[in-house]
Regions:
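Residues in flexible loops and secondary-structure boundaries
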Residues: 24, 36, 80-83, 91
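Alpha/beta-hydrolase
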Residues: 1-60, 70
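Conserved loop-alpha-helix segment in the C-terminal half of the alpha/beta-hydrolase fold
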Residues: 50-77, 83, 88, 95-96
Length: 97
């Protein structure tokens, strides 16, 4: 069971565990090559699930998004915000339209 490790609600854990795949560690060790096309993106959004079993490693990304002027939202739920808070997640996404 991996779901408990990222703060998934107990009711959602079987679904998350069934859908989870091994995480590619290369994302931490390999350099990312960007084309520059990201500069043309006009709207930026970061959604942070704040309820985790320990200090969130994602909080720094939430804070960076806020500092950069992104639309940054903190939801009181686990890592899989779309499972824990589907209606709030939809509201946040629709706010960009």
């Amino acid at each position: 069971m991996v779901a408990w490790n990222v703060g998934v609600n107990a009711a959602d854990a079987p679904t998350v565990d069934a859908l989870a795949t091994p995480f590619p560690l290369g994302c931490f060790t390999e350099k990312l090559k960007l084309s520059g096309a990201y500069r043309s993106v006009k709207k930026h959004l970061y959604v942070h699930g704040t309820v985790l079993p320990r200090e969130s490693p994602f909080r720094v990304f939430y804070e960076r998004a806020q500092a950069a002027g992104w639309s940054a939202h903190a939801l009181a739920c686990g890592h899989d915000v779309m499972l824990d808070e589907p209606e709030k997640t939809a509201e946040v996404l629709e706010s960009l339209i």
